[in-house]
Amino acid sequence: MNLNLKKWYSTGTPWIWLTAGAVAISIVMVLGLLVLLTVRGMNHFWPKDVMQAHYAPPNAQQEITITQVIGEFVESENIIAQQIISSGIPVDESQPEYRRELLKLGNRDLTGADFSWVLTDFISDVEYPANLVVLERREWGNFYGYLQSVSEAGTVVAEVNIDEVQDDSAWDEFTARLERALALHDEIYKIENQDIGEINYRVERLRLQQRRLELDGRATADALADIAAQRQDLETEYEVLQVSLIDLYEQVNRDTATFIAANAQEKVIELADVVRAYRPNQMGLGAKLLGYGAKLGEF
């Protein structure tokens, strides 16, 4: 028996099975990680519906101020009454627990806060308007609001007709100009991060080449003149790219859009600052899957 076992070990078969098992476990772990990322990403990247509601909690003076909230539901939890009272909201202590919801309100440049807890008992008039817009911006995070108008160099070129619920002309104008701005931004990115980077790399190569000639004692007048000529050509290319950048920035900063956020706050947003715009409350499953895939791909 021991002889057979030793012979089996000597063939290397156990190590083959051990290696195969380790590879199988690694594959399962990788697949599990991908599934975990997909599930977690579903919550982060999925285009969620955006609600609009009125929120009217009492204050310490028993006064009620009604505010409008617009945002995405994130999570909810139960909280004891005493904790709510200690935060300055007088609630009925005879009710042991209250439900509260965490909303992503965005509009950080207007309110200073991206998220806020609200007590479910004081929320009313919840609705999901079809024309609510979500903007993903390069700065300040998400913006939530209603499109009012689109302007070119300060002149309004499209405006929402409040009497026509199904009128999407302003939205179509906005999305067309946003696509233009995104294309221009891609050109700017290419020049700044690729073309100019390539020039800087070549300039550095010339500097090292000149230094090598000097160390080797081969820095003749002709060699230095050749390097200087190449450096001048690169400077000319750089100046041409700078002129192109100035023109592209003027073009990309041309268009703006005016939005109305919660509580009738007006906000003018440059289309150059927008990465993506969509109206989630009127998106079907297919459109949301495409949006999810695009965001996941960027990640």
Question: Which functions belong to the PLM regions below?
Answer:
Residues 1-20, 27-32, 39-299:
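Membrane-topology segments of multi-pass transport proteins
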